[in-house]
Curated annotation (Swiss-Prot):
This is Histidinol dehydrogenase. PROSITE patterns: HISOL_DEHYDROGENASE. Catalyzes the sequential NAD-dependent oxidations of L-histidinol to L-histidinaldehyde and then to L-histidine. Substrate binds at residues 234, 256, 259, 325, 358, 412, 417. Binds 1 zinc ion per subunit. PANTHER family: HISTIDINE BIOSYNTHESIS TRIFUNCTIONAL PROTEIN, HISTIDINOL DEHYDROGENASE HDH. The active site is at residues 324-325. The gene is hisD. InterPro entries: Ald_DH/histidinol_DH, Histidinol_DH_CS, Histidinol_DH_monofunct, Hstdl_DH. Its cofactor is Zn(2+).
Length: 429
């Protein structure tokens, strides 16, 4: 892991290069995804079967997981896992319940009623990865806010494995309240949810993480359906002063690096001695990590430690990065919170490590990446509702403002708009 002692602009340039390196999207992948989406749109289940055999190496007659399979899954998971899952569910619900909003009704004294109706989406699709790692936590994080919002039907898709679907995923889906589960993955699963097939229902919105093919497929179908976000590789920035614990920081950096080779792990510190200790700790901890090959590749390609003169400058640099995860290993981290402008999720102090947010604390772990924390937010209950405005005017209320409407409509050259007002008062030209 490279230690960089440079000025702000040079450090920022280097970080941008790291991010560009982590987000290289080959044109061949985009073309392949576009072809998959088009084929599923046209050939539907036939295309799903073809791509499942091609990419997953299995032939599946019925892609829907039966109720019996879901019930049996609980026999294959540990009681400790179920206990942890239930604790996570409790915390996720208690946090997201506070995000729920009410419809608005505004009645004035002049015969005017205005308002906003908030309604849940009818149905959504949740993508759950099934590649190099299995993510039951993602099931809870994507499904529970939707349930709290009142979504009527939740469909889950996840890639098949040789022995079926990981029972931990099925147990999480059952606990969260998923209505239907399908053994289908990749870009073809996203296309199926967007357009519908003989087996898989069309949904209104698709959420959930995935690999590059899944991310590009979501981009491809956006507009046909809504999506949560186009997630890039995982990323973490740790800001540390001389009080930072090198073991903790190294462990937290590696917690993101182990996701995949394109993940980004950056430490920004005011203390060069700490930087050296973190570098050594990363090497030491890599020796015993089961996913060390992935983590090492990530650290070598997209990892760095930046030395800056002050915490103020560290915060400026972090705001320019707008990371998915930001940890503050500094004195009085709560005081620095006001100066964090752009970050998906912020972890304050040495005992609020990123995995706490990933699994148990309650805030959502579906977060904006690749600098999009400047304008995107974590997944929330709001992502599963839509809003309609409504208004009612009495004749007198409309009469009071009609001249303003006519003036504005005529100024824009939209004379039928003006006439629609005038005709109600016998003033049409």
């Amino acid at each position: 892991m490279e230690i960089v002692c440079e000025d702000f602009q040079k450090a920022l340039t280097k970080i941008k290069l790291l991010r560009e390196n982590a987000n290289i999207i080959e044109e061949t992948v985009q073309r392949s995804v576009r072809e998959i989406v088009q084929n599923v749109r046209e050939s539907r289940d036939e295309a799903l079967s073809f791509y499942t055999k091609k990419f997953d190496g299995v032939e599946i007659k019925d892609v829907r997981v039966s109720e019996e399979e879901i019930k049996q899954a609980s026999m294959f998971v540990e009681s400790s896992f179920l206990e942890a899952l239930q604790e996570a569910k409790k915390n996720i619900i208690s946090y997201h319940e506070k995000q729920k909003r009410q419809s608005m009704f505004d009645c004035t004294s002049k015969g005017i009623i205005r308002g906003q109706i908030i309604r849940p989406l009818e149905n959504i699709g949740v993508y759950v990865p099934g590649g190099t790692a299995s993510y039951p936590s993602s099931v809870l994080m994507n499904v529970l806010p939707a349930k709290l919002a009142g979504v009527k039907k939740i469909v889950m898709v996840t890639p098949p494995r040789a022995g079926g679907i990981d029972p931990h995923i099925l147990v999480a889906a059952s606990l969260a309240g998923v209505d239907e589960i399908y053994m289908i993955g990749g870009a073809q699963a996203i296309a199926a949810l967007a357009y519908g097939t003989e087996s898989i229902p069309k949904v209104d919105k698709i959420v959930g993480p995935g690999n590059l093919y899944v991310a590009l497929a979501k981009r491809e179908v956006y507009g046909i359906v809504n999506i949560d976000m186009i997630a890039g590789p995982s990323e973490i920035v740790v800001i540390a002063d001389e009080t930072g614990n090198a073991k903790y920081i190294a462990a937290d950096l590696l917690s993101q690096a182990e996701h995949d080779e394109r993940a980004t792990a950056i430490c920004i510190t005011t203390n060069i001695e700490l930087a050296k200790e973190v570098e050594k700790e990363i090497e030491r901890q890599l020796e015993t990590l089961p996913r060390s090959e992935i983590a090492r590749e990530s650290i070598n390609r997209n990892g760095a430690i930046f030395i800056v003169p002050s915490i103020d400058e560290a915060l400026q640099l972090s705001n320019e990065i707008a990371p998915e995860h930001l940890e503050l290993h500094i004195k009085e981290p709560m005081n620095a919170l006001a100066y964090v402008k752009h970050a998906g999720s912020i972890f304050l102090g040495p005992y609020a490590p990123e995995p706490l947010g990933d699994y148990l604390a309650g805030p959502n772990h579906v977060l904006p990446t690749s600098g999009t924390a400047r304008f995107f937010s974590p997944l929330s209950v709001d992502d599963f509702v839509k809003k309609s405005s409504f208004l009612s005017y009495t004749e007198g209320a409309l009469r009071d403002v009609k001249h303003h409407i006519v003036e504005l409509a005529n100024k824009e050259g939209l004379h039928a708009h003006a006439r629609a007002i005038q005709i109600r008062f016998g003033e049409e030209e």
